[in-house]
UniProtKB/Swiss-Prot annotation:
Belongs to the NAD(P)-dependent epimerase/dehydratase family. SUPFAM superfamilies: NAD(P)-binding Rossmann-fold domains. Its EC number is 5.1.3.2. Major UDP-glucose/-galactose 4-epimerase under glucose-rich conditions involved in protein galactosylation. GO terms for biological process: galactose metabolic process; monosaccharide metabolic process; UDP-galactose biosynthetic process. It is an enzyme of class 5 (isomerase). Its cofactor is NAD(+). It holds the Pfam family GDP_Man_Dehyd. Pathway: Carbohydrate metabolism; galactose metabolism. Disruption phenotype: Leads to sensitivity to thiabendazole and microtubule-depolymerizing drugs. This is UDP-glucose 4-epimerase uge1. InterPro entries: NAD(P)-bd_dom (IPR016040), NAD(P)-bd_dom_sf (IPR036291), UDP_G4E (IPR005886). One of its GO terms (molecular function) is UDP-glucose 4-epimerase activity.
Length: 355
């Protein structure tokens, strides 16, 4: 035990985008970390970068949460005192095409994880949920900006997996009084570690706006596809609440600290800035960060997308003593720094840098 905190935090999906940044914050705050990741949409190089940035050793297990014996072995061999759960498939568009894969991986994997926690008496559980559990908040009964009390209704298989998992956790905490769970419904992550050593590294063509724009800027993609410009917004493009990944990582650790001090049973928190940006506003901010206009084409709407997802983060601001501190422009600047430094992300078979 090297940290000032007692026990070890298991981070599932810790080699992924948000997970890796959260591991850095955990280690900087004195926690010890064990990462479990099947590397289906991440690379082990991220683990090496975590160690490089923090100067601390991370225990890494390449384990799929569907592999119950392998997961049980991790719990048996480590003194795990809390779990932060990021692992899962995460693309809205892809989930519409392969729904069974999303239901099997995301839901069954989480059930296996909770069963291991129960077996090994691990209490505190931070679940990486999503604003997609709100479905379309502009429907009747919805509210913008979105409070935690907004009716939930997933509009894509991905969003429904997050909603079902929330329901599973809520049901389990009603009968399992030793489970203490935070449901973190975050909005649209972006940005990268200010060192430029960690960032979003999607395998294949990016599904999210910021890494897509970044690959256009660095020359890996020809142009940005804007999925629809006929939404009822100021410029016709959808509105999202973008949150810097470092702000998001700090929120996960704030939630964990809160659980260690308070028994909440099961409580949701929105993680966002409270300010929405359209696709074109983000594109303009990124163009400013790069220093030139970036090409785009308008294409038909994407299945499962909704017009506006903007958070009301008041509960997290007040209870977790957390709020965002980085702007959409800073998100773009940090993303661009990462993409310039590592045009091919963690794929070290490419040595090209962008000048």
């Amino acid at each position: 035990m090297t940290g000032v905190h007692e026990g070890t935090v298991l981070v599932t999906g810790g080699a992924g985008y948000i997970g890796s940044h959260t591991c850095v914050v955990l280690l900087e705050k004195g926690y010890d970390v064990v990462i479990v990741d099947n590397l289906c949409n991440s690379r082990v190089e991220a683990v090496h970068r975590i160690e490089k940035l923090t100067g601390k050793k991370v225990i890494f297990h390449q384990v799929d949460l569907l592999d119950e014996p392998a997961l049980d072995k991790v719990f048996a061999n480590q003194n795990i005192s809390a779990v932060i759960h990021f692992a899962g498939l995460k693309a809205v568009g892809e989930s519409v095409q392969v729904p069974l894969s999303y239901y099997k991986n995301n839901i069954s994997g989480t059930i296996n994880l909770i069963e291991c926690m129960k077996k090994y008496n691990v209490r505190d559980f931070v679940f990486s949920s999503s604003a997609t559990v709100y479905g379309d908040p502009t429907r009747p009964g919805g509210t913008i900006p979105i409070p935690e009390s907004c009716p939930r209704e997933g509009t894509s298989p991905y969003g429904r997996t997050k909603l079902f998992i929330e329901n599973i956790i809520e049901d389990e905490t009603k009968v399992n009084k030793s489970l203490n769970a935070a449901l973190l419904r975050y909005f649209n992550p972006g940005g990268a570690h200010p060192s430029g050593e960690l960032g979003e590294d999607p395998l294949g063509i990016p599904n999210n706006l910021l890494p897509y724009i970044a690959q256009v800027a660095v020359g890996r993609l020809d142009h940005l596809n804007v999925f629809g410009d006929d939404y009822p917004t100021s410029d016709g493009t959808p509105i999202r609440d973008y949150i810097h990944v470092c702000d998001l990582a700090e929120a996960h650790v704030a939630a964990l600290d809160y659980l260690r001090q308070h028994f909440v049973s099961c409580r949701p928190w929105n993680l966002g800035s409270g300010t929405g940006s359209t696709v074109f506003q983000v594109l303009n901010a990124f163009s400013k960060a790069v220093g030139r206009d970036l090409p785009y084409k308008v294409t038909p709407r994407r299945a499962g997308d909704v017009v506006n997802l903007t958070a009301n983060p008041t509960r997290a601001n007040e209870e977790l003593k957390w709020k965002t501190s980085r702007s959409i422009y800073e998100i773009c600047v940090d993303t661009w720094r990462w993409q310039q430094k590592y045009p091919y992300g963690f794929d070290l078979t490419h040595t090209k840098t962008y000048k």
